[in-house]
Regions:
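Residue(s) in the substrate-gating loop at a strand-loop-helix junction
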Residues: 118
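Substrate-binding pocket helix/loop in short-chain dehydrogenase/reductase
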Residues: 74-75, 82-84
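Active-site loop-to-helix junction immediately N-terminal to the catalytic Tyr of the SDR YXXXK motif
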Residues: 78, 124-132, 144
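Conserved NAD(P)H cofactor-binding loop of Rossmann-fold oxidoreductase domains
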Residues: 67-72
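Active-site helix of classical SDR
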Residues: 98, 134
């Protein structure tokens, strides 16, 4: 049974993953609100990854980072704070999570890290400037981590 740490498992993609994986895996969920699902294989920690201290985890085989936010506005209505918030949630939160749990992850069974991007990084979709910029940074982070951490 794999031990999977999901950040952002209370809604959206994170919740769908949690629901799909919880039957056959031990899931540790970190999110600001608890998921609606309750299961013997699920442990939840209420935590804001950006502002709170992350909980101690003894064992983990995979990290899945998927807190959700999307700021769909025309560039004329986006504020610099919107860009900062999207970057903080998508990049800084992922880096904080990875740095915190990497020593434990390296001891895991076939360790893996999963981060999410958006098709807007390659298609250039309208109203996606802020999230596309943040997710492009996530893609760069993934490439760098792959080169650094691959066996």
């Amino acid at each position: 049974m794999r031990k999977i740490l999901i950040v952002g498992g209370s809604r959206g993609i994170g919740n769908a993953l949690l629901s799909k994986l919880v039957e056959e895996n031990k899931i540790i969920n970190i999110s600001r609100i608890p998921p609606s699902l309750s299961h013997v294989n699920l442990t939840h920690h209420t935590c804001d990854v950006l502002t709170d201290e992350l909980p101690t985890v003894e064992e983990v085989d995979s990290i899945v980072y998927c807190p959700g936010s999307i700021n769909l506005k025309p560039i004329s209505r986006l504020k610099l704070e919107d860009f900062r918030n999207d970057f903080e949630i998508n990049v800084i939160g992922a880096v904080k999570t990875i740095q915190q749990y990497l020593p434990v992850l390296k001891r895991g069974n076939k360790p893996s890290i999963v981060l999410f991007s958006t098709v807007a990084t390659t298609l250039g979709m309208p109203f996606h400037a802020s999230v596309s910029a943040a997710k492009s940074a996530v893609e760069g982070l993934v490439k760098s981590l792959g080169a650094e951490l691959a066996p």
